[in-house]
């Protein structure tokens, strides 16, 4: 008879990066279900880890929240870089990225609240700066293509995401309309394409 593995023994066999990934995934699920006030022992249980394991990886809940935000920002940075290199062209790649990020935001209740909580965290600031630089490169490429208005900046993207986030509170799917309007506003002047 083969002995059953306990969650603790499975945890012990994981690499450090797998442990971190499992904790972040569990934290995202628990925070989405229970809110940011969810206790660390609940997150540990969801990950199949002991509470001490959580605190070894993340000394405080603030550090755990920051790691979640950094993970999402890194995904956005990677998306912006991939979009800039896309064969679809900078404008199409930019709008595709905006749709993907807005949909993630609309379905990820934790991200906005966590970002507001840990926006001043040093790791979040570094990741935000890298993401902003990647978005600036994508905007420059779309601007050079002639499809993005000349005065568009990453601040405009932040405003657009704030508006789409607010629209999720109004009505199901309202964020889509807000994003459509925002993308139209970002486009360079074209006949018949003015708001």
List where the protein language model places each region.
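C-terminal peripheral helix-coil segments that are non-catalytic and often amphipathic
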Residues: 1-7, 133, 137-145, 163, ...
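Hydrophobic/aromatic residues within well-ordered alpha-helical segments
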Residues: 19, 72, 76, 90, ...
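Helix-turn-helix/winged-helix DNA-binding modules
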Residues: 35-36, 56, 149
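Hydrophobic alpha-helical connector segments
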Residues: 67, 74, 78-106, 120-123
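Helical hydrophobic small-molecule/effector-binding pocket
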Residues: 87-115, 144-150, 169-173
């Amino acid at each position: 008879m083969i002995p059953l593995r306990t969650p603790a023994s499975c945890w012990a066999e994981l690499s450090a990066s797998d442990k971190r990934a499992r904790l972040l995934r569990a934290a995202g699920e628990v925070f989405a279900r229970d809110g940011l006030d969810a206790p660390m022992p609940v997150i540990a249980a969801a990950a199949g880890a002991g509470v001490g394991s959580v605190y070894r990886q993340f000394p405080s809940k603030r550090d755990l929240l920051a790691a979640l935000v950094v993970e999402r920002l890194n995904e956005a940075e990677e998306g912006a870089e991939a979009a800039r290199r896309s064969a679809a062209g900078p404008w199409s790649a930019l709008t595709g990225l905006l749709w993907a990020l807005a949909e993630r935001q609309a379905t990820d209740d934790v991200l906005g609240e966590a970002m507001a909580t840990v926006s001043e965290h040093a790791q979040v600031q570094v990741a935000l700066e890298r993401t902003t630089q990647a978005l600036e490169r994508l905007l420059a490429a779309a601007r050079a293509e002639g499809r993005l208005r000349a005065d568009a900046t990453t601040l405009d993207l932040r405003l657009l995401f704030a508006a789409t986030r607010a629209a999720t509170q109004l009505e199901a799917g309202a964020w889509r309309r807000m994003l459509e309007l925002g993308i139209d506003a970002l486009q360079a002047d074209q006949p018949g394409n003015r708001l």
